Amino acid sequence: MSKDEISYQILYRYSLEKLYSTLTRRVDNVLSFALVFLGVGVTINVGSPFILGPGIVGIAILKRVLRFGTRSAQADRQSRAWLKLFNTQHRFPSDKTLFLAFTSLEQDASEAWSMLIGPAIVMTESALGKTPIEPLTAGEKLCAFLSGATKSQPADRN
C-alpha cells in the first residue's frame, strides 16, 4: 500500500469508529432514558405495572446483553487512536512502519454495523476534498443522521 492509500484507510477507520461510537452512545442514552421513564411510571403509579415492569426488564436485558455503553467507549478509544495515527503519520520514516502501525491498530477495531460503512466512506472522501461517488441508501442516510455524520470532520495533519 502506498502512503496515500494508508492515509485514506486510517481516516476511513477513524470515521467508522467515530460514527459507531456516537451511534452506540446515543442508543445507550435512549435506552437509559426509557428505563428512567418507565421506572418513574411505575413509581408514581401511571399505567399498568404489568406492562411497565416487563418493559423495564426487557430494556435492562437489552442493555446488559448488547452493552451499548461499553461498545461506545471502546469505539471512542479506537477512534482517538486512529486520529492520533492520522495526525502523526508524517513522523513515520517509511511506508512499511506506518503500515505496521496501521495493522496493529486494526487488530483492535470494533465490529461496526455495516450501515455505517457508506457514511464513513462519504465522510472520509469529504474530509479529503473528494466528491463521494455512490449515493447513500435511505437506511444509511438515517444511520448517518443518527450518528452525527452530517458534521464536518477535521482532516488536517498537525
Where are these predicted regions, by residue range?
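Alpha-helical transmembrane segments and their immediate juxtamembrane boundary regions
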Residues: 19-73
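Cytosol-facing regions at membranes
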Residues: 1-29, 44, 69-158
